Amino acid sequence: MSNKMWGGRFTSAPDAIMEEINASIGFDQRLYAQDIAGSKAHAKMLAAQGIVAAQDADRIAEGLDTILSEIEAGNFTFKRELEDIHMNVESRLAELIGASAGRLHTARSRNDQVATDFRLYVRDTLDALDAQLADLQRALAEKALAHAATVMPGFTHLQTAQPVTFGHHLMAYVEMVARDRGRLADARKRLNECPLGSAALAGTSFPIDRDATAKALGFDRPTANSLDAVSDRDFVMETLSAASICAVHLSRFAEEVVIWTSPSFALVKLSDKFTTGSSIMPQKRNPDAAELVRAKAGRIIGALTGILVVMKGLPLAYAKDMQEDKEGAFDAFSALSLVVAASAGMVRDIVPDEKRMEKAAGQGYSTATDLADWLVRALNIPFREAHHITGRIVGLASDRGIALHKLSLDDMQGVDARITQDVFSVLSVVRSVRSRVSYGGTAPTRVRTQAKRWLKKLGVPA
């Protein structure tokens, strides 16, 4: 005889392997707080609608509060044979308050229950991530403001391209994280509809008040279609998509930290707080925090891929496949939280080698574009012609193994007689960055303005 809560029509217990593959309590116990909150709101609504007696609803609420305290104190025993968080909570509720516990599941299915729990959990996760990302932006903007005029090489193809400032480079990530926060906020807006009351798939014949439960749980409204409500996992996929893009951004930053801290570049230093040593090479200082930020992006992207593949072939409405929606998501959310925290820590810890940065910024003829721009402005030469002239001058300097500013005026006039002594005023990396005053440019004045604007927006006093 089956003793499962769903076992009325079953005459024997499930096989041990069936219990093992069917159970989700090993991971969905994370939903305990959301499950209890949803059940309390549901019980209160049932009483308000006269579907259950007020005293039963009160006993249910008291019992659920006791269970919450037990779980948070570590005194609750989760049982695999009860499958999931819903049955574990309901079983314990029955032990605490007796028959009244059986009233709780009136007008409700585990299908709408888990959909509600998971939305609440993802919403809580989104709120926590947004706060973390705002802190990362503060760290970036503060460091950018401090280094608005610190010259460093800007790269394309990982080859020195033009001088920029360290502050400008960091502010690029402030903008990326702003888009990440926007995507996560958009996901939260679409998530914030309440499935509770959709029951298994078709709704319920009981006179429930779905608006009341939606409001009690902080949702904007109840979901409009019961089939969609119990079979929808868009909110997980969308959140994981935004999380994956965010992880890619932070992976790119981490890759740069790995490169910059390499002795071959030596542009920045991380302290002992965010590096580790080698078990055999005593001189090593390894940027493990950055490397793990980079690696965890793969786990987060993997979770997105996993749920997309799980959901791609499911007919409406619920199928047990959807139990696989949580474990990867939980892992990805935890990973992203750690990635954001580690990134903020590294930003605050990182110290640029300003002299080496400025020297590196001048390598690779990085002011060649400034030379071409000067030819256009000062001599009214069309840019394409100026580009060609500059290329010849760079070739001359390269052949001699010297920097552009080491060429003589005669050398340059040998390429084009129109060039004057004023050309040397634009060949300094410091002058180069100061000249990039267009909106969004690397000029220190622009970087300071942008950093201060963001810090004000993020609530940091001037």
Curated annotation (Swiss-Prot):
InterPro entries listed in its UniProt record: Arg_succ_lyase_C, Argininosuccinate_lyase, Fumarase/histidase_N, Fumarate_lyase_CS, Fumarate_lyase_fam, Fumarate_lyase_N, L-Aspartase-like
UniProt keyword Cytoplasm present:
yes
The protein's UniProt keywords, in alphabetical order, are: Amino-acid biosynthesis, Arginine biosynthesis, Cytoplasm, Lyase
The record ties this protein, via CDD domains, to: Argininosuccinate_lyase
Does the keyword field hold Repeat?
Answer: no
Location of the protein in the cell: Cytoplasm
* EC class of the enzyme, as a word: lyase
> Which Pfam family is one of this chain's hits?
ASL_C2
Any idea of its EC number?
4.3.2.1
Highest taxon above the source species: Bacteria
UniProt family annotation: Belongs to the lyase 1 family. Argininosuccinate lyase subfamily.
What this protein is called in its record is: Argininosuccinate lyase
This chain's source organism reads Xanthobacter autotrophicus (strain ATCC BAA-1158 / Py2)
